[in-house]
Amino acid sequence: IQRPRTMYGVTKVTTELLSDYYFNKYGVDTRAVRFPGIISNVTPPGGGTTDYAVDIYYSAVRGEKFVCPIKEGTLMDMMYMPDALNAAIMLMEADPTKLIHRNAFNIASMSFDPETIFHAIKKHVPAFEMIYDVDPLKQRIADSWPDSLDDTCAREEWGWKPAYDLESMTVDMLEKLREKLKK
């Protein structure tokens, strides 16, 4: 997406372009990735478009019915926080002579819609329920994003590969949140 409409997207592209400028003009070793939605068991959801994918786990662990603000069938790329941290470290440690794209590496891990994550959780929490109450603003933002990102350059230039898929992330999220919310 080269013409983003959200403040996050605008500032991200601005940073990428400034980083390219400083690399080309002054030789500053700049590097950046384009993260998908990040799912964390440490940071609670803050109301962003992709935060439904964190909030749904909290609802499952608390035994609450989840009210999904994104409509069924809306695919979005997501990544578990341990993979995001690992990607940042891998890129920082990468051989600079092999980096062609430097400041605009797409990285991907998994792409799913609300139904898919719901069913992944339901395998472990059989009584879990979900209903939809679509937030028009969040849905517009979600609809403006690609369904999936091509991370071929990151894989080829610095060996990016995620460790988590939806199933392994779900097991870990449920385990960590059960422990966290017990306190």
Model-derived features: positions:
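Catalytic helix-loop patch of NAD(P)-dependent Rossmann-fold dehydrogenases
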Residues: I1-A32, I39
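A short acidic, helix-capping loop that chelates divalent metal ions and anchors anionic groups
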Residues: P4, N41-T43, K138-R140
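Glycine/proline-rich active-site loop of Rossmann-fold NAD(P)-dependent oxidoreductases
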Residues: V13, Y26, I39-V54, M81-P82, ...
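Solvent-exposed polar/charged
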Residues: N24, Y58-S59, K123, E156
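Residue-level detector of anion-binding/catalytic polar loops
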Residues: D29, K65, K161
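A conserved pocket-lining segment of Rossmann-fold NAD(P)-dependent short-chain dehydrogenase/reductase
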Residues: A32-P45, D55-M79, D83
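C-terminal substrate-binding subdomain of Rossmann-fold SDR/epimerase-dehydratase oxidoreductases
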Residues: P69-K71, M76-K183
